[in-house]
Amino acid sequence: MITDGIMHKVREVYQLLRKEPGIIVGVSNRHVHLSREDLETLFGEGYELTPVKELRQPGQYAAKETVTIVGPKGAIENVRVLGPVRKETQVEISRTDAFRLGVRPPVRDSGDLEGTPGIVIIGPNGILVKEKGVIIAKRHIHMHPKDAEYYGVKDKDIVKVIVESGDRRLIFDDVLIRVREDFALEFHVDTDEANAAMLNTGDLVYIVEF
């Protein structure tokens, strides 16, 4: 039987293993990234996204525009479009969303779309039938190269992250490190993962070494 005393000792060990400072959490709700061509199909020729909220990652923003995504079993309205436009359209949803839509997306890094299921996207000016592009985003940490040097990691490394706040302390395994010059330090999880750990955007988590 695991006693409170044992759990207290375990938490003390985790605190010794964790790397300071903590990393800010960004909880990612379902959203869509659109290519230029697909943006114009959905919203009209020459259309430009309207930024309404800057995201923590430099140059990225939530747009005013929303779409409806439709799968074999259902639809979800008011799905936010994130900007700027990308080379390829990508739809990021949670596993809960996937059940609602009737699709079975894999857990993938952003941009890794080969072999992913398609979906229908409806905008005010048109409808897209995408043959691929739906993923459940792999949990990851964005880092600037200076952050990666500080934490002793490199691009594509896999680490563990501990959640110490709230009543659902846990460790996220298999967390991908993504390093780029235009990234800011942030731990990204989807809404299912955040709910499991009772995490909110702005909370802090810690990389741990074993």
From Swiss-Prot:
It is an enzyme of class 2 (transferase). Keywords: Acyltransferase, Cytoplasm, Metal-binding, Transferase, Zinc. GO terms for biological process: propanediol catabolic process. Its cofactor is Zn(2+). Pfam families: PTAC (PF06130). It comes from the Bacteria. CoA binds at residues 27-29, 73, 80, 99, 195. There are 2 Zn(2+) ions per monomer; Zn(2+) and CoA bind inbetween the 2 domains in each monomer. InterPro entries: Asp_de-COase-like_dom_sf (IPR009010), PTAC (IPR008300). Zn(2+) 1 binds at residues 31, 33, 92. Disulfide bonds: none annotated. GO terms for molecular function: acyltransferase activity, transferring groups other than amino-acyl groups; metal ion binding. Its EC number is 2.3.1.222. The keyword Cell wall biogenesis/degradation does not apply. It catalyses: propanoyl-CoA + phosphate = propanoyl phosphate + CoA. The keyword rRNA-binding does not apply. Pathway: Polyol metabolism; 1,2-propanediol degradation. Belongs to the PduL family. Formed by 2 beta-barrels, each is capped on both ends by short alpha-helices. Involved in 1,2-propanediol (1,2-PD) degradation by catalyzing the conversion of propanoyl-CoA to propanoyl-phosphate. This is Phosphate propanoyltransferase.
